[in-house]
Regions:
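Short loop/turn motifs at secondary-structure junctions
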Residues: 2, 43, 138-140
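Residues that line or immediately flank small-molecule/substrate-binding pockets and catalytic motifs
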Residues: 10, 33, 148
Length: 170
């Protein structure tokens, strides 16, 4: 099997990659939402992967990952890899998770990556209040990303610990 084409469409604001093969199997991958500017970066790799075997995912990726693995190029490379794994799974008649080592758990906790609450300030207590609101949300699993670093100068807040699960999965 050989790759015959790579195309990118912007659907909404998301770059969607389609890789086609000479055997009629297509693979689809998605880049980060709200980043339509990734389209030319994804297309940059087209000629580098044409003619390659898409089921040799790691070999194809070694050839392009060196060309750019940091943002925003890394997002472009990841979308291509996603499409390659899609082809490999379809070709083998297996879901991709089986190709990646198999099922580890029956349930996966949802990460709250988009529900945000307005902050009243930038003090540690404000972050703790914001995190409590996120904890009380039905998804109850989130991460503070707003300029808080493990190595930053933010003081500890009583009862708030980095890396401690808010609630274990049932």
């Amino acid at each position: 099997m050989k790759i015959t084409d790579l195309k990118v469409a912007i659907i909404g604001n998301a770059p969607i990659v389609r890789i086609t093969t000479d055997e009629g199997i297509d693979g689809v991958g998605a880049a980060e939402y709200r980043k339509p500017y990734l389209k030319p970066m994804i297309e940059f790799y087209r000629d580098m992967i044409i003619g390659k075997d898409p089921t040799d995912v790691e070999r194809v990726m070694l050839g392009i990952r060196r060309m750019g693995s940091f943002k925003p190029w890394g997002a472009a490379v990841s979308a291509i890899e996603m499409a390659l794994w899609d082809i490999a799974g379809k070709s083998a008649g297996l879901p991709v998770y089986k190709l990646l080592g198999g099922k580890v758990r029956d349930r996966v906790q949802v990460y709250n990556g988009s529900v945000r609450y307005e902050m009243d300030g930038l003090e540690p207590e404000n972050y703790a209040e914001n995190m409590q609101k996120m904890k009380d949300h039905p998804y109850n699993f989130s991460i503070i990303k707003q300029a808080v670093s493990f190595h930053g100068g933010m003081q500890n807040v009583d009862g708030f610990y980095y890396g401690t699960p808010v609630k274990k999965m049932r």
